[in-house]
């Protein structure tokens, strides 16, 4: 699916892609921007001391970008059981009990997908942190744009965790997932803001 088709489906009534797929896409673009900075830096005499590290980071950034794209598919697949669970009958006690059991499992699956995405986005932000230090100053603004996209995707993915855990009956599991999401939000946002400030110091007149 090309970008235009993706956006058309995203804007439609189709259940997927939704916010999760959008977050994965935005984060992948952000990581790709970071990788672009590396590509513009590699081979430059001025940054020769970092050449070996840059080559390693290009591979890592490419891997994270690919995995974020995979997260888009995983998020869509994770939402399907939840979508089906909402349609289960609940007219009798037995039906209601079955529906609640299926719903609880579906909510868990639907929460795990964005949580995994958040972990990967924080990896991307950490990588851009290093890129913003050793990357070409001529392309440093792109590292700033990339990290802002990753930050937005991280916060967006957290909402997809919380909206599902809020409905879970197993409070212990829900609280554990919320705690993990909270920590990722704090870690990712603090580092993203630090990177943004570093970039601003380089580009602002």
Please provide the spans of the model-predicted regions.
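Phosphate-handling active-site elements
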Residues: 33-53
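A structural-propensity feature for long, helix-poor, extended segments
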Residues: 46-84, 184, 191
């Amino acid at each position: 699916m090309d970008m235009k088709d993706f956006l058309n489906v995203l804007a439609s009534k189709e259940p997927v892609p939704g916010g999760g797929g959008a977050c994965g896409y935005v984060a992948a673009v952000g990581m790709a921007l970071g990788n672009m900075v590396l590509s513009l830096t590699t081979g430059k005499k001025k940054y020769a001391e970092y050449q070996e590290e840059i080559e390693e980071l290009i591979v890592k950034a490419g891997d994270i970008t690919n995995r974020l794209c995979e997260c888009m598919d995983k998020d869509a697949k994770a939402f399907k059981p939840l979508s089906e669970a909402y349609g289960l009958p609940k007219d009798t006690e037995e039906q209601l009990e079955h529906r609640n059991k299926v719903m609880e499992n579906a909510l868990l699956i639907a929460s795990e997908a964005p949580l995994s995405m958040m972990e990967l986005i924080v990896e991307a932000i950490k990588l851009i942190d290093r890129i913003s230090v050793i990357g070409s100053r001529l392309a440093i603004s792109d590292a700033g744009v990339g990290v802002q996209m990753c930050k937005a995707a991280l916060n967006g993915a957290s909402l997809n965790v919380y909206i599902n855990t809020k409905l879970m009956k197993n409070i212990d599991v829900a609280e554990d997932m919320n705690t993990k999401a909270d920590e990722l939000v704090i870690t990712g946002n603090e580092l993203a803001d630090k990177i943004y400030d570093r970039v601003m110091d380089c580009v602002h007149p």
